[in-house]
Amino acid sequence: MRIWPQTWAALLDVDLIEVGRKRPLVGVLGALRMLPDIVSHLLHGELPPRPPEHLRLRDLATIPLDKGGWVLLGLREQDEIALGLVGKFWRPVIDFASVRSAQEFVDFSEPGFAKTIYALSVRELGPRRTLLSGVMRTATTDEQARRWFRRYWTFGVGSGAHLLVHGLLDVTREMAEERAAQHAT
């Protein structure tokens, strides 16, 4: 990847909805993950919530927690962003914990939950060269949650998560390279 400032801007601007459109498999996986929530609403006589038109990485920490919003754990401008999410991800309709700050994320220990950190970074490798990387880590709050999460991750979800992360990084790279090309002209 080229041009570090454009890469950072592209990372924050990447639209997860657009990633699903540009990478059909990512879109299908996202739709499959949302399906149980939609069915649950319909079974309760409710209309499912409208999906957002855009879902940019920079906005994830502004989404309500019960809607899958992430907590901003740390931000080093032009360098790295870390987001956290606490929930029972293995359930068809995810039960999200109400964690509103980085400190609450660190302190959260209620049994039966998993805590995920998603860190994305941009590193300048030299003139016109940039490394964009993403790391996702999950820890559970107790042994039972660990068993549930391990089953969930092992039976295909882990592979799907890797496809989602790769799609996000790939679309970010494309955006950064396009911006760099526009900047050069």
Tell where the protein language model's regions lie, with residue ranges.
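Hydrophobic ligand-binding cavity/cleft-lining segments
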Residues: 1-62, 67-71
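Secondary-structure boundary elements
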Residues: 3-6, 123-129, 141-143, 169-183
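Short, hydrophobic/aromatic alpha-helical segments in well-folded domains
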Residues: 10, 118-121, 168
